[in-house]
Amino acid sequence: MKIAVTKFLGTNCDLDVCHAVKLAGGEPELVFFTQENLDSYKGAVIPGGFSYGDYLRAGAISARTPIIKGLKKMVEEGKPVLGICNGAQIGLEAGFSKGTLTNNLNAKFICKWVYIRVENNKTPFTQYYKKGEVLKIPIAHAEGRFYADDETLDYMYKNNMIVFKYCDETGEVTEEANPNGSIDNIAGVCNENQNCVLLMPHPERASEKILGSDDGLKMFKGMIDYAKRI
């Protein structure tokens, strides 16, 4: 089960993602941003990092490289595509979902463990979680604050495009549990067809208990199992 793991200039979480994909039973393969054709892959993960130094804004340059055409085709064909941190920024810049990611409210880089609540368990990546389940996953970003205008946000709620929200350990969505000022505590979103998920927390860094949590591993297992069925 070949899964493309994208590699841009400045990507630094690719090997961690490859490890998580292997743990989930997949066969990860690093694919550079110059490659446009991804037809031989059953899914893709866009890992985190600081592609192109986050110049202009995070993900803006990467979203204009050749591989985006192949990723868009994957999304349109219903293949599972996961964007993590910088990968989520790239995915939103490329138009894979609605909304945008901008500077954290405190204007600082934030690196810590957080809790997120599953709002939508109908995606390939969340199929093995219960709706309302609380996951312990770390974040590491400076431009992770999700924003969408009222009209866009209403559209996203109506189409079940909100996948994760920041919460406390008990699952309560509070202002104190929001690390970056994201509107409605939103930590992850998806497209209308539910096969592309973009989130700021790093599930690959929570894929083994020795890391402090293995709550993120089910995202990769869900992806692999979904890819086997399509």
Swiss-Prot record:
Which sites are catalytic? 85 (nucleophile), 202, 204
Q: Which NCBIfam families match?
A: FGAM_synth_I, PRK03619.1
Please give the pathway this protein is involved in. Answer: Purine metabolism; IMP biosynthesis via de novo pathway; 5-amino-1-(5-phospho-D-ribosyl)imidazole from N(2)-formyl-N(1)-(5-phospho-D-ribosyl)glycinamide: step 1/2
UniProt-recorded name of the protein:
Phosphoribosylformylglycinamidine synthase subunit PurQ
Recorded hits in Pfam families, A to Z, give: GATase_5
Query: What does UniProt give as GO cellular component?
Result: cytoplasm
Q: Point out the gene that encodes the protein.
A: purQ
The segment(s) forming the Glutamine amidotransferase type-1 domain are 2-230
Reactions catalysed, semicolon-separated, are:
N(2)-formyl-N(1)-(5-phospho-beta-D-ribosyl)glycinamide + L-glutamine + ATP + H2O = 2-formamido-N(1)-(5-O-phospho-beta-D-ribosyl)acetamidine + L-glutamate + ADP + phosphate + H(+); L-glutamine + H2O = L-glutamate + NH4(+)
Disulphide bonds annotated for this chain are: none
